[in-house]
């Protein structure tokens, strides 16, 4: 799993039929301070995240374990919206 921030949306009118109805988001991976950590991916959004939100992603076969993504050609899924990130007992991120 990796933490990222949704930075955009992908619109595709022609795609694999198994992806029809899936919301595609662009996610930039971030460190625990919210700074870019290198890496941008397109992910299927399973939780209704919006642009600017901090999210938790899963990749590889783990991305195909949600009811929305099972048996679909997906490599990365947004599986949670982060409300609070706590490191060593200190809150380093709180959702606005």
Regions found by a protein language model. Give the residues of each.
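Residue-level recognition of beta-strand microenvironments
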Residues: 6-9, 13, 46, 81-84
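A generic local secondary-structure boundary/capping motif
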Residues: 14-17, 44-46, 66-69, 92
């Amino acid at each position: 799993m990796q933490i990222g921030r949704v930075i955009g949306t992908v619109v595709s009118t022609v795609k694999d039929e198994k992806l029809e109805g899936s919301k595609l988001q662009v996610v930039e991976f971030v460190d625990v301070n919210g700074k870019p950590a290198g890496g941008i991916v397109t992910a299927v959004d399973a939780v209704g995240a919006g642009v600017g939100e901090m999210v938790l992603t899963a990749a590889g076969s783990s991305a195909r374990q949600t009811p929305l993504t099972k048996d679909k050609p997906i490599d990365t899924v947004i599986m949670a919206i982060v409300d609070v990130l706590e490191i060593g007992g200190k809150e380093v991120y709180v959702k606005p």
